[in-house]
Swiss-Prot record:
It comes from Komagataella phaffii (strain GS115 / ATCC 20864) (Yeast). It is found in: Cytoplasmic vesicle, COPII-coated vesicle membrane; Endoplasmic reticulum membrane; Nucleus, Nuclear pore complex. Component of the coat protein complex II (COPII) which promotes the formation of transport vesicles from the endoplasmic reticulum (ER). The coat has two main functions, the physical deformation of the endoplasmic reticulum membrane into vesicles and the selection of cargo molecules. It also functions as a component of the nuclear pore complex (NPC). NPC components, collectively referred to as nucleoporins (NUPs), can play the role of both NPC structural components and of docking or interaction partners for transiently associated nuclear transport factors. This is Protein transport protein SEC13. GO terms for molecular function: structural molecule activity. It holds the Pfam family WD40. The gene is SEC13.
Amino acid sequence: MVTIGNAHDDLIHDAVLDYYGRRLATCSSDKTIKIFEIDGENQRLVETLIGHEGPVWQVAWAHPKFGVILASCSYDGKVLIWKEDNGVWNKVAEHSVHQASVNSVSWAPHEYGPVLLCASSDGKISIVEFKDGGALEPIVIQGHAIGVNAASWAPISLPDNTRRFVSGGCDNLVKIWRYDDAAKTFIEEEAFQGHSDWVRDVAWSPSRLSKSYIATASQDRTVLIWTKDGKSNKWEKQPLTKEKFPDVCWRASWSLSGNVLAISGGDNKVTLWKENIQGKWESAGEVDQ
């Protein structure tokens, strides 16, 4: 396990490994992003990226077929795109359509191209494609009335390749959006009620098995699992646990294979969960801090 010492001067909000597990990006309330090279249990700070004017909430690596590219989002309402060439990092694009904090960024499945999904406290969700370092005209939709906390892409779907994503907001709702070719925008396909407080995170499982899975984590101290099999058009929900979590559930994250779910909460614990053959979710342990 790699431990990053006092790299930042304030709270660290996100830490993400790149596709190959060789680089780690961290971001913080100190307004900076740090890039580390990872070699076994050793790490070396190689760059500090400065460009945001507020806390940086999240970072996301693009697929390596697009180069060494990182996106970051901040309380300052901006999404910045950073690129490394021959060991030198530069800001290559700025996406600034939002009027309030941008709370999450995620790259689409690489088959769709370098497309970024952004969720903001201004209630809007933006989808923007980057070509040769410059952003194209973004799609901006009204997502959740009081603010959008998170959004997550669906894995590429066969045979129709319809683009979908899920979002969670301060209106306690979870929504699924589908790209409409005729309208050239994303339209609301489903809206789920299940949480009694803000939805803090949403995560669509990358698995392309017979079922689709979405995990939603909430301020109400619950995590819900939404599932849909190929035969049914209806999403079913079940709570991850019978009892509420000890504190707010901040983040939900699937393993690459989509069969293990990690939940991090306000109690500073990360718990792991797996589905059993009866379709019930069981504890798979805790991550040692």
